[in-house]
Amino acid sequence: MEAMAASTSLPDPGDFDRNVPRICGVCGDRATGFHFNAMTCEGCKGFFRRSMKRKALFTCPFNGDCRITKDNRRHCQACRLKRCVDIGMMKEFILTDEEVQRKREMILKRKEEEALKDSLRPKLSEEQQRIIAILLDAHHKTYDPTYSDFCQFRPPVRVNDGGGSHPSRPNSRHTPSFSGDSSSCCSDHYITSPDMMDSSSFSNLDLSEEDSDDPSLTLELSQLSMLPHLADLVSYSIQKVIGFAKMIPGFRDLTSEDQIVLLKSSAIEVIMLRSNESFTMDDMSWTCGNPDYKYRISDVTKAGHNLELIEPLIKFQVGLKKLNLHEEEHVLLMAICIVSPDRPGVQDAALIEAIQDRLSNTLQTYIRCRHPPPGSHLLYAKMIQKLADLRSLNEEHSKQYRCLSFQPESSMKLTPLVLEVFGNEIS
């Protein structure tokens, strides 16, 4: 039995290397595969099967030791059959006519099952494909992977341990236009374009008033060296989020009031989602092209935030990165995040929910159709959990932001758009 097991074992994978020519072990002709436990050509395979089925007895007309080749293999059937047995061909591997028929039926059945399975497999509808195409285009128009606009921000200033500071470039440049300076060269397209939401729309909502006299909330100015630069970065990102949101299918069908509510409440969450593209797990930083724009945890603390926000933010970024989302999934997740019917203050929750359901169904179908396992396993549920994590991060960001915005020294470093979006808390 051990000998039988050995003879029926699969050949070494190296034997199937397509770059290595397959040679028939009987006659030396080109082999077509393993037949009856040996590598042979089609001719010797058929010869062995016929001989075994007929129980043929051959006699060598010579000395019983003929050399079998492709050219003379028909001259001596006895030595050819002997050679078949010598290289390991076994009659036990030959199927009966009934077994051959059953095998054919099984192959046919398997093909039919595969065809049925394929027909039942979910497919993206034309409408869903259109939604994905629109969102991809929206993202490409509002996210610059070269980060070339970062040079227009107020420069990053990183305070040394000894108290000194080193701006990455001369500090003479004024705050760019996205912080409210209309004379700057930076475009305000996503705020002031007739097709887009005007940033002044946000100013209809009053700033929240909270008591900031608690000395534990006071931040020394020396701790805020990165605040001007990161405030400009966030202001710039808010504009891009507005531009992306305006291109979400169905978003323009909402009232301007609901659009404002959704954008104000989701802006920081979408910014966190967007930033995952530049996040690297090698050193837990956000790398945005130029080394001056490589942001570490210490940079975020120098903008007034503490580990109560930073630690869960890093955990979120790592978890999201490990999901290895396709770009299609990434843009759908951002859209779903923005169009959330449970945001406080929305008026037409039913319409918002209908838009979000359409996006969610598209995401689920895309995962089933296009994201291969094992990555697709529970992927949708994991992505929805990320949205829940963002709500917690949003809440903590709001708490820490208030500490900044209600201190005149620090709020002066913020931009008007940041003050309007994050200062008018809807809670």
Swiss-Prot record:
Region called Interaction with coactivator LXXLL motif, residue ranges: 246-264
Binding site residues for Zn(2+) 1: C24, C27, C41, C44
A cellular-component GO term for this protein: cytoplasm
NR LBD domain ranges (all copies): 127-423
GO MF term list: nuclear receptor activity; vitamin D response element binding; zinc ion binding
Description of post-translational modifications: Ubiquitinated by UBR5, leading to its degradation: UBR5 specifically recognizes and binds ligand-bound VDR when it is not associated with coactivators (NCOAs). In presence of NCOAs, the UBR5-degron is not accessible, preventing its ubiquitination and degradation.
Subunit structure: Homodimer in the absence of bound vitamin D3. Heterodimer with RXRA after vitamin D3 binding. Interacts with MED1, NCOA1, NCOA2, NCOA3 and NCOA6 coactivators, leading to a strong increase of transcription of target genes. Interacts with the corepressor NCOR1. Interacts with SNW1. Interacts with IRX4, the interaction does not affect its transactivation activity.
Protein name per UniProt: Vitamin D3 receptor
Gene of this entry: VDR
Biological process per Gene Ontology, one example term: vitamin D receptor signaling pathway
Phylogenetic lineage: Eukaryota, Metazoa, Chordata, Craniata, Vertebrata
Similarity comment: Belongs to the nuclear hormone receptor family. NR1 subfamily.
Residue ranges of the motif 9aaTAD: 416-424
Location(s), subcellular: Nucleus; Cytoplasm
Ranges where the record places region Disordered: 158-183
Entry keyword set: Cytoplasm, DNA-binding, Metal-binding, Nucleus, Receptor, Transcription, Transcription regulation, Ubl conjugation, Zinc, Zinc-finger
Organism: Saguinus oedipus (Cotton-top tamarin)
DNA-binding region ranges: 21-96
UniProt free text on domains: Composed of three domains: a modulating N-terminal domain, a DNA-binding domain and a C-terminal ligand-binding domain. The 9aaTAD motif is a transactivation domain present in a large number of yeast and animal transcription factors.
Region Hinge: start-end pairs: 97-126
Zinc finger (NR C4-type): 24-44, 60-84
Binding site for Zn(2+) 2: C60, C66, C76, C79
